[in-house]
From Swiss-Prot:
InterPro entries to which the protein is assigned, alphabetical: DNA-dir_RpoC_beta_prime, DNA-dir_RpoC_beta_prime_bact, RNA_pol_asu, RNA_pol_N, RNA_pol_Rpb1_1, RNA_pol_Rpb1_3, RNA_pol_Rpb1_3_sf, RNA_pol_Rpb1_4
Family of the protein in this entry: Belongs to the RNA polymerase beta' chain family.
Subunit structure comment from the entry: The RNAP catalytic core consists of 2 alpha, 1 beta, 1 beta' and 1 omega subunit. When a sigma factor is associated with the core the holoenzyme is formed, which can initiate transcription.
Organism the protein comes from: Bacillus licheniformis (strain ATCC 14580 / DSM 13 / JCM 2505 / CCUG 7422 / NBRC 12200 / NCIMB 9375 / NCTC 10341 / NRRL NRS-1264 / Gibson 46)
Protein name: DNA-directed RNA polymerase subunit beta'
EC number(s) stated in the UniProt entry for this protein: 2.7.7.6
GO molecular function, one term: DNA-directed RNA polymerase activity
GN (gene name): rpoC
Entry annotated with the keyword Metal-binding: yes
GO aspect biological process, one term: DNA-templated transcription
Co-factor note (free text): Binds 1 Mg(2+) ion per subunit. Binds 2 Zn(2+) ions per subunit.
Recorded catalytic activity of this chain's protein: RNA(n) + a ribonucleoside 5'-triphosphate = RNA(n+1) + diphosphate
Protein keywords: DNA-directed RNA polymerase, Magnesium, Metal-binding, Nucleotidyltransferase, Transcription, Transferase, Zinc
Cofactor(s) essential for the protein: Mg(2+); Zn(2+)
Length: 1199
């Protein structure tokens, strides 16, 4: 067998008849499979042991030789070699065909490869191959032409006229002869000459033919090999036949298809031997051709061959295609040993890096380890007795299991794994029961809840795997989200509520203004009921453990609450004392106004201070981010555990409940509604008088009711009591929001009908009051659409992620610096006046391309190739700089990847990205994972043509697939001035742009809103009307940079509108993959063919070569490919074939004799090598691990 890790590339090509015979271990002559009496394979049949090897290890067919000592002996009675049975998985056979047949992939594919080589139409080919017409193979000196088709009648007539002077025949034999006669070199030269003169369709056809002929010439494949003389038979274990309970047999469809081929082949041989009339022989040959077609690709031509119950049989092609095919089912996703799955329940007492593993599950997963340990400790004499001990679950087994499990991380995975945080490592602790315990803080990353979710457990076996799991994948290491670099482990729900309740301040609470000497005394007072958690009190500063107080402050009193004293205990001592939820308190220090001199009137001071809001979810997130920035991972994960415990404890103590009485209906709701109704009646009156159009009336009514709802919402939130449980839930960010509350107590507001148009009758009732029947009915539309959308969205979003992963899977950080001198000009992304992404967000974690200087002082803020961190970014923005040149993946010169400098900081770790990081896949996951949060709807606000702009997920797909957008905008192709805007017929408008040399006129579609005015100066690529730009058009009139920028901005716009933040660099990586190819226009003196798509790097290499020789370089135009197209155009045929259109990709690759260099991740997974990313990169693979035992307490210290 091949050593998987030792080959460098993989070739694919056409197999010659001799090659097929050399693979084979014998000819399959009979269609029989198994003898139904003895259940032994028939000799010379499809399962023959002499050809394919023995069915049982070390045992021949007749039983003369048994046992391993006869290894390699060929039995003299039955001819079977004594060897392992698993050779039946690799030994092939063959069938000698009595007549050549065509391979359907090459004759039927689009474009037909056979047709291009012979310059015949696929229709003509089909007529010849399936015996409907004759083709002239040698016209000799008759007026007939080579490759001319003749019907039966014409053929007879010409035979009578010319006798045997000319040769014409039908079937694959005729095509075989034509293919053998082709002189590739001569044809290629003729085509190259033709290209110089031809135009239009002839040129396109010539380019296609040239491509195929060049492919044959360069790859060493012979065109005649597209016709098969001999058919390979795949190993029997890959098309098994198994006996079912009732004595019946279940068999693979391939056996049926092979059987038909063999039957027809044998019948044809017999007919030929008998010298049957040609019409019978021809019919049999046609049937043989159809049988082989069905075997290779059933259903590609004509009606598929069906089995019992009219089910089409699965052919060889179907075995590779689709989700259930070989590629996606068995090569890219395998089931693995040492794994299990179970329901998850919450484990609030676990540490960040722990999970609870049910005892019986752990025992089964770690069985081999436990057995080894039992023998080593002398608790069992040998492995067999150790196994027996485990199966009987004897008490000493548990102690051994405990010791084995310590230090051995396991991986937990929850499907669907949308991003890399869907698999994390934990240290297992044994728990009773049968459910896996999961730490509450990692739920966000897994998107898990405990309503019956299940998770899978996997055990990393080797020392290297365990080390990687512990160092890279431990849950305590994965605190930041790779998509935006923000903490992903922020507390949620109960934890938020507990900390919110704890940090509340209530005026006039019991014991207000008391002074304590230290925290302990305050707690004692609280426990004895003298003060409340929410009471504002004063504490001597010098007794607090916090190290950030100044000497001056240490001699004062601090005004705070008992709850905040408790809250600050969980923060590191060198972190500012948190007394108010502000940015300055988190980043700098506790504000001065909370400090009082000894002897001051504390009660008076407290009365004069306004109430500070409690700590909400967002503030907790900021505290975590700041702690991570200052103290890194270990300290952060310990702090998170303390915050979690505090949250749970105090949300329990708060005892927050929700009752009907908590939902208070607004008093002046009726007045607001009546006022709105009055306005609506007014609008209706205007409409009836013909003062406004139907469209305007609708718009106004909608806006009146929206305003009414907003008024109610505002008043509601104001009228609520601070300690109303529902208000606390929504205000803290634990659950629900203002809109939910408005629907409960205010009014439901406007609803959309099934078409997405807003119904102008609002729902005036709230849930608390109860809806009328009509209101209830109207509500069901929206609810149902929501559920349907969600179901569709999940599938769409998953497919988007899959396409994104496929297009970027080979983008890996390959080197430290690519040495490019280009970059991009980063400025804030805006939409009108609204800022979508601020400049500092775009700069953080990027390398500067040019030095950044202060506009006034000229001081250099950031040097060239220096990393811009948070502080530098803020400094740049405060200096009033609005645009900065930065390094970007767009302009990186590294082939098959990006360099460290152009990529910048790794968002998942907050440090420099490592060489070997698979940034392409991380980018794809970061864009795909929030896909489910995007809306599906195309918003119709009243159906104005200009407003039907796609948003949400469909817009993202439109952008990444580079489709023509809906509601397309017109763009200017030249620089110039808008000379005039004229109304032409049917409300259409004509815009005339006057350039320096020429003028262009554009017709704006009916009703489109213009974005330019007369006399305005515009540049090429500028939008003239409202709508989305077609990026392909934009690329034609401008340059790559403009298109890259446009796509980046548009993608960010969609995500930010939905409140999802994604790092620019992820979108950059994806867009870069879409703009990798160049379409060759003129080949110059290079080897490349005009009209072909080439990778930019191959294109520049080819040009470099000819320029050095002083010849003419090729010219090309950059092409924007959608992600599906880009995936299929990748250099790796394995990756492309496993993505989509498997047969087309393989057909093409085989003809070109493609060579897969195994650079990407997918190719290596398919052939079973380590992926060439991360620790699998060659420069890291040479490192050998040295085992040093150290206890996990040092990794993440115990509490």
């Amino acid at each position: 067998m091949l050593d998987v890790n030792n080959f460098e590339y993989m070739n694919i090509g056409l197999a010659s008849p001799d090659k097929i015979r050399s693979w084979s271990y014998g000819e399959v002559k009979k269609p029989e499979t198994i003898n139904y009496r003895t259940l032994k394979p028939e000799k010379d049949g499809l399962f023959c042991e002499r050809i394919f090897g023995p069915q049982k290890d070390w045992e021949c067919h007749c039983g003369k030789y048994k046992r391993v000592r006869y290894k390699g002996v060929v039995c003299d009675r039955c001819g079977v070699e004594v060897t392992r049975a698993k050779v039946r998985r690799e030994r092939m056979g063959h069938i000698e065909l009595a007549a050549p047949v065509s391979h359907i992939w090459y004759f039927k594919g689009i474009p037909s490869r056979m047709g291009l080589v012979l310059d015949m139409s696929p229709r003509a080919l089909e007529e010849v191959i399936y015996f409907a017409s004759y083709v002239v193979t040698d016209p000799a000196n008759t007026p007939l032409e080579k490759k001319q088709l003749l019907s039966e009648k014409e053929y007879r007539a010409y035979l009578d006229k010319y006798g045997n002077k000319f040769q014409a025949s039908m079937g694959a034999e005729a095509i075989h002869k034509l293919l053998q006669d082709i002189d590739l070199d001569k044809e290629v030269d003729m085509l190259k000459e033709e290209l110089k003169t031809s135009q239009g369709q002839r040129r396109t056809r010539a380019i296609k033919r040239l491509e195929v002929l060049e492919a044959f010439r360069n790859s060493g494949n012979k065109p005649s090999w597209m016709i098969l003389d001999v058919l390979p038979v795949i190993p029997p274990e890959l098309r098994p036949m198994v006996q079912l309970d009732g004595g019946r047999f279940a068999t693979s469809d391939l056996n049926d298809l092979y059987r038909r081929v063999i039957n027809r082949n044998n019948r044809l041989k017999r007919l030929l031997d008998l010298g049957a009339p040609s019409i019978i022989v021809q019919n049999e040959k046609r049937m043989l051709q159809e049988a082989v077609d069905a075997l290779i690709d059933n259903g590609r031509r004509g009606r598929p061959v069906t089995g019992p119950g009219n089910r089409p049989l699965k052919s060889l092609s179907h075995m590779l295609k689709g989700k259930q095919g070989r590629f996606r089912q068995n090569l890219l996703g395998k089931r693995v040993d040492y794994s299990g799955r179970s329901v998850i329940v919450v484990g609030p007492n676990l540490k960040m890096y722990q999970c609870g593993l049910p005892k019986e599950m752990a025992l089964e997963l770690f069985k081999p380890f436990v057995m080894k340990e039992l023998v080593e400790k002398g608790l069992a004499h040998n492995i067999k007795s150790a196994k027996r001990k485990i199966e009987r679950v004897q008490p000493e087994v548990w102690d051994v299991l405990e010791s084995v499990i310590k230090e051995h991380p396991v991986l937990l995975n929850r499907a669907p794994t949308l991003h890399r945080l869907g698999i994390q490592a934990f240290e297992p602790t044994l728990v009773e029961g049968r459910a896996i315990r999961l730490h509450p803080l990692v739920c966000t990353a897994y998107n898990a809840d405990f309503d019956g979710d299940q998770m899978a457990v996997h055990v990393p076996l080797s020392a290297e795997a365990q080390a990687e799991a512990r160092i890279l994948m431990l849950a305590a290491q994965n605190i930041l989200n790779p998509k935006d670099g923000k903490p992903v482990v922020t507390p949620s729900q109960d934890m938020v509520l507990g900390n919110y309740y704890l940090t509340l301040e209530r005026p006039g609470a019991v014991g207000e203004g008391m002074i304590f000497k230290d925290t302990d005394e305050a707690l004692l007072a609280y426990q004895n009921g003298y003060v409340h958690l929410h009471t504002r009190v004063a504490v001597a500063v010098n007794s607090l453990k916090n190290e950030t107080f100044t000497e001056e402050q240490r001699s004062k009193l601090l005004i705070t609450t008992v709850g905040k004293l408790i809250f600050n205990e969980i923060l590191p001592p060198s972190f500012p004392y948190m007394n108010e939820p502000t940015k300055s308190n988190i980043e700098e220090k506790t504000p001065d106004r909370f400090f009082l001199d000894y002897g001051a009137d504390v009660k008076e001071a407290i009365k004069n201070q306004e109430i500070n809001p409690p700590f909400k979810k967002g503030i907790l997130g900021k505290i975590i981010a700041e702690i991570f920035k200052r103290f890194h991972i270990t300290e952060t994960s310990k702090m998170l555990d303390r915050m979690k415990n505090l949250g749970f404890k105090y949300s329990t103590k708060a005892g927050i409940t929700v009752g009907v009485s908590d939902i208070v209906v607004l008093d002046d709701k009726q007045e607001i509604l009546e006022e709105a109704q009055g306005k609506v009646d007014n609008v209706m009156k205007q409409f009836r008088r013909g003062l406004i159009t139907e469209e305007e009336r609708y718009e106004r009514v909608i806006s009146i009711w929206s305003a009414a709802k907003d008024t109610i919402q505002g008043k509601l939130m104001k009228s609520l009591d601070e300690i109303n449980p529902i208000y606390m839930m929504s205000d803290s960010g634990a659950r629900g929001n203002a809109s939910n509350f408005t629907q409960l107590a205010g009014m439901r507001g406007l609803m959309a009908n099934p078409a997405g148009r807003i119904i102008e009758l609002p729902i005036k009732s709230s849930f608390r009051e109860g809806l009328t029947v009509l209101e209830y009915f109207i509500s069901t539309h929206g609810a149902r659409k929501g559920l349907a959308d969600t179901a569709l969205k999940t599938a769409d979003s998953g497919y988007l992620t899959r396409r994104l992963v496929d297009v970027a899977q080979d983008v890996i950080i390959r080197e430290t610096d690519c040495g490019t001198d280009r970059g991009i000009l980063a400025k804030a992304i805006t939409e009108g006046t609204e800022v979508i992404e601020r400049l500092e967000e775009r700069l953080v974690g990027r390398f500067a391309r040019k030095p950044v200087k202060h506009p006034e002082t000229g001081e250099v803020l950031v040097n060239e190739n220096e990393l811009i961190d948070e502080d530098k970014a803020i400094e740049i923005v405060e200096a009033g700089i609005e645009e900065v040149w930065i390094r970007s993946a767009f302009t990186c010169n590294t082939s098959h990847g990006v360099c460290k400098r152009c990529y910048g900081r790794n968002l998942a770790t907050g440090t420099d990205v490592e060489v070997g990081e698979a940034v392409g896949i991380i980018a794809a996951q970061s864009i795909g994972e929030p896909g489910t949060q995007l809306t599906m709807r195309t918003f119709h606000t009243g159906g104005v043509a200009g407003d039907d702009i796609t948003q949400g997920l469909p817009r993202i797909q439109e952008l990444f697939e580079a489709r023509n957008p809906k509601g397309q905008a017109t763009i200017s192709e030249i620089d110039g001035v808008v000379a005039e805007i004229n109304e032409v017929r049917d409300k259409q408008q004509e815009i005339v742009v006057q350039g320096e040399v020429e003028s262009r006129s554009y017709t704006a579609p009916y009703n489109a809103r213009l974005k330019v005015t007369e006399g305005e100066k515009i540049s090429r690529g500028q939008v003239l009307t409202e709508g989305s730009v077609d990026p392909k058009e934009l690329l034609k009139v401008t340059d790559i940079t403009t298109v890259q920028e446009y796509l980046l901005h548009e993608v960010q716009k969609v995500y930010r509108m939905q409140g999802v933040e994604i790092g620019d660099k992820h979108v950059e990586v994806m867009v870069r993959q879409m703009l990798r190819k160049v379409r060759v226009i003129d080949a110059g003196d290079t080897e490349v063919l005009p009209g072909t798509l080439l990778d930019i790097h191959q294109f520049t290499e080819a040009n470099k070569k000819v320029l050095l020789e002083g010849k003419r370089p090729a010219t090309g135009r950059p092409v924007l490919l959608g992600i599906t197209k880009a995936s299929l155009e990748t250099d790796s045929f394995l990756s492309a074939a496993s993505f989509q259109e498997t047969t087309r990709v393989l057909t093409d690759a085989a003809i070109k004799g493609k060579r897969d260099e195994l650079l990407g991740l997918k190719e290596n997974v398919i052939i079973g090598k380590l992926v060439p990313a991360g620790t699998g990169m060659l420069n890291y693979r040479k490192v050998k691990p040295v085992l040093q035992v150290q206890s996990s307490d040092e990794m993440v210290p115990a509490e």
